[in-house]
């Protein structure tokens, strides 16, 4: 692990950046600059992460708590600074398994779940920062809050020992990212989460049933709050985003789970974009692409409204192949919930009429200032062009 100072850095050329990174990785001495000055940015005002305080991550880090890391050993060492403000810059692929395959459920649980402490910014350098074979966990059990994750690719973990549930088949356990147990003030920006090199058509069968090895992409649950997800790409995944742990978890979740989603792309995701229990979700200017006849990631729905969950959808784009205008209500599914409103969204190039889908209007006030751009083909393409890792 190599520490770098807190002075800002203006990138003048690709060669200069490459030289700096090479020096950090090979010399074993402290470099002179902060490689990615965007690590000093706070969560945008247009989002729940800006409310009831702010989300600054590790922006206040002193020079001895700014790092460049290239592997899991360096990453966990940097995280060991605890709640002190820190900036952890990622270059290349971090294999959370350390190159040693997980033997079984217990081994995967022990080694694959990486807890990100309070006052931390994790940010990728350049275009190839990546996490594989594990999960980033933002767990509020010990008071964790004020975390920023930016410009990284997360390949969803593969459960090496799924559990079997009678009537439901094989179920996997691990998510790409999990915000849980009261964690609050979290900003996820320019992140890509995808099944990557192991897609669902590669599942085998066991005891006559599909051996499912993926769980969620990004889950937010158990009383977590004040989260903004922006400019991110969710690609090729089934159960994408669960907000709210269960129908019976009202004691922990009620009045929490305020989440904003904007300028994100949900591409070839089957469902849960998101599925909501108890949470209050604001989704605007996002792009949803799918196909109800996709042979691998068959589109089921985007918004799932569960127990006491509510969603305000504004200016979103739905391009769903083989879905007619008369079936527009397929984009929002009722799971014991009743509150959903949409304004200005587009389905397959025409205004989406979601007013007759059987929901009550979303009436809660949005406390922050935001601007919904009218959804056009050009805007949808621009959002797509700028979403995900490597686009910061």
Swiss-Prot record:
S-S bridge residues: 329-357
Catalytic-site annotation from UniProt: 272
GO MF annotations, alphabetized: metal ion binding; pectate lyase activity
Cofactor binding notes: Binds 1 Ca(2+) ion per subunit.
Keyword Secreted: yes
Cofactor section: Ca(2+)
Chief site of localization: secreted
Keyword annotations from UniProtKB, A to Z: Calcium, Disulfide bond, Lyase, Metal-binding, Repeat, Secreted, Signal
Top-level taxon: Bacteria
Catalytic activity line of the entry: Eliminative cleavage of (1->4)-alpha-D-galacturonan to give oligosaccharides with 4-deoxy-alpha-D-galact-4-enuronosyl groups at their non-reducing ends
GO-annotated cellular components: extracellular region
Pathway: Glycan metabolism; pectin degradation; 2-dehydro-3-deoxy-D-gluconate from pectin: step 2/5
UniProt xrefs under Pfam families: Pectate_lyase_4
Class of this enzyme: lyase
BP GO annotations: pectin catabolic process
UniProt binding sites for Ca(2+): 173, 175, 215, 219
Subcellular location, record wording: Secreted
E.C. designation(s): 4.2.2.2
Stretch forming the signal peptide: 1-31
Family: Belongs to the polysaccharide lyase 1 family. PLADES subfamily.
Function: Involved in maceration and soft-rotting of plant tissue.
Protein name: Pectate lyase A
Organism from which the protein derives: Dickeya dadantii (strain 3937) (Erwinia chrysanthemi (strain 3937))
The encoding gene: pelA
